[in-house]
Design a protein with these regions (language model features):
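C-terminal beta-signal and adjacent terminal beta-strands/loops
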Residues: 342, 435, 444-453, 477-532
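Structural signature of Gram-negative outer-membrane beta-barrels, strongest in the C-terminal barrel
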Residues: 85, 189-193, 199, 208-209, ...
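Gram-negative outer-membrane beta-barrel transporters
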Residues: 232-235, 332, 337-340, 361-454, ...
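Surface-exposed extracellular loop regions of Gram-negative outer-membrane beta-barrel proteins
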Residues: 98, 107-109, 216, 248, ...
């Protein structure tokens, strides 16, 4: 969960509540408070935020087992700064998150008195410091920063009233670094920005689920440095840079170059080309800690002891066209992309353990490619009245067919699972009258392959899912209560067409991971916001 805050520009307070209901009456209530404060001399400021959310569980097929979990979360924090001088600033941030989620049946009972429960309670505390120093001519900038986050999780992932399916996880991350930027009037052939720096990242993970014989301890440390130079002019921008990292789980340092170029041959046309490279260390990630219920047992993810790093090389090429037609501003974008993955991570089903639980091993496939084209268009009368749409065609395939099930009759598959070939979006925003705004938005997801696992692997199958179009509408109206206080009322419908998965698994032997399509059913929502 990421929290993005902003630097305050004036004193303000905002209090809001949004409440939503599905057709069956399932409620989702979210209340938030935000405040910005500035000192009279504008040398100090703070942005405070807090929110409380409560969402009921949702049972689509009325089988007594939730298809969307219940949620109870509280978030609070702040971001503040103090200008220590005319050319220096100290910034500090803190956030706290308490998040509880539970799905399954008999949610009013303790987890070990249910047929299926997937439950997790996270307590997250994090913060950071950053100090920036500029020279009077703005040509030199030095920044140093450090942040720390501590995550504590108490969980239960179990079936059939298992008293031993409780778990505890601790995960703390420290990041520290420094960066220097030098703005040059000319370097070789054009004005340029030179940036270099160093960073240290340490993550300490301990995940315990003794009922499943799992006691994972993982320490991951990465330290590295980077350098980048950007040449810029009105018609040409060129960026070249590189990063070198040493991770304690990889034998040799990893060198990751990157380059980008932007060229404007004529006033209304921008051409771009880029190359980036990267890697993923051979370690456990958040998704590896999750446990799913399948066929009355659970599925667990383990790491291949010989897991190797995953490397990527990505290329992009795009063209932007801008044009004014009367009062309408037009923008068209066409983009092609290609990514090659070497030793790509892959989940391979293995033989069940002695308790009958499904075992998936994170191992390496030889490689994979992701390539496609993307088109976007926007027409705007002004910032409040515009229409925007985009479409992407993408192919994601492994270099060789991969085994996704241990079933004797299950064919291998080259296509990446859960990766649609087609997806897109559309958004229409307008202000038909003073203080009134309206929006219509939608996302399209094409067909994809989703695995459906059963207790007997010979029954496993790949589902070719249907396409989905998730359409939403929203209206809002501003009412000036006083010269400085405004109330906004809003209402709308999410997923108007109730585009939702039709073949959700049923009962206590369900595959809890067999989920696809829009995340929420048709939901009517109403809101009110006060700002001053």
């Amino acid at each position: 969960m990421n929290i993005i805050t902003k630097e305050p520009h004036r004193n303000s307070v905002s209090l809001a509540n949004t409440t939503g209901f599905t057709d069956s009456g399932t409620a989702d209530v979210n209340t938030s408070l935000n405040a910005s404060m500035l000192s009279d001399d504008r040398r100090a400021g703070a942005y405070l935020f807090a929110s409380v959310r409560n969402r009921d569980n949702y049972d689509r097929n009325d089988d007594g087992f939730s298809d969307i979990p219940k949620v109870a979360s509280q978030i609070a924090g702040f971001r503040a700064y103090y200008k220590t001088g005319a050319y220096s600033k100290l910034t500090f941030e803190y956030h706290h998150i308490n998040d509880f989620r539970r799905g399954g049946d008999h949610l009013e009972r303790p987890p070990h008195e249910s047929d299926i429960t997937e439950q997790a309670r996270h307590s997250i505390n994090g913060g950071g410091l950053q100090f920036d120093l500029f020279t009077p001519n703005q040509r030199h900038k030095i920044g140093v920063y450090a942040s720390y986050q501590d995550v504590r999780r108490e969980s239960y992932y179990g079936t059939d009233k298992n008293p031993d399916a409780y778990g505890k996880t601790s995960d703390n991350t420290l990041v520290a670094g420094a960066q220097y930027t030098y703005r040059m009037h000319k370097f070789l052939f054009l004005p340029a920005h030179l940036t270099f720096g160093m960073e240290y990242n340490r993550n300490n993970l301990h995940d315990r689920m003794l009922g499943y014989d799992r006691d994972m301890r993982q320490m991951s440390c990465t330290y590295g440095g980077y350098v980048q130079n950007e040449w810029e002019s009105e018609r040409l921008n060129f960026v070249i840079g590189a990063r070198i990292d040493k991770n304690n789980r990889i034998g040799n340092p990893v060198f990751s170059p990157r380059a980008n170029i932007r060229y404007t041959p004529v006033r209304n046309v921008i051409l771009r080309a880029g190359y980036t490279s990267g890697y993923r260390a051979p370690q456990a990630y958040d998704e590896d800690l999750h446990v799913n219920a399948v066929g009355g047992n659970v599925s667990l993810i383990v790491l291949d002891p010989d897991l190797k790093p995953e490397y990527s090389n990505s290329f992009t090429l795009s063209a932007d066209l801008y044009r004014n037609t009367g009062k309408v501003q037009l923008n068209l974008l066409a983009e092609g992309f290609y990514t090659s993955l070497d030793d790509v991570f892959f989940l391979e089903e293995r033989a069940p353990d002695s308790e009958g639980n499904l075992i998936f091993m994170r191992t390496n496939a030889r490689g994979a490619t992701v390539r496609g084209i993307n088109f976007e268009a926007k027409a705007a009368l002004d910032p409040d009245n515009y229409i925007q749409a985009g479409y992407t065609y993408q192919r994601s395939t492994y270099k060789e067919a991969m085994s996704w099930s241990t079933g004797a009759s299950q064919a291998k598959e080259k296509r990446m699972l859960r990766s649609p070939d087609h997806y897109g979006y559309v958004s229409l925003n307008g202000s038909p009258a003073k203080s009134l705004s309206a929006s219509v938005y939608g996302t399209f997801s094409g067909s994809m392959l989703v695995p459906h696992y059963f207790e007997n692997p010979d029954d496993d199958r790949l589902k070719e899912t249907p396409c989905f179009f998730d359409l939403g509408i929203k209206l809002s109206y501003d009412i000036a209560l006083t010269r400085r206080v405004t109330m906004q009322v809003s209402g709308g419908v999410k997923n108007v067409l109730d585009s939702f998965q039709k073949d959700i698994d049923r009962g206590k032997t369900k595959d809890a991971g067999y989920i696809y399509g829009p995340a929420f059913p048709r939901t009517f929502h109403f809101g009110v916001r006060f700002t001053m």
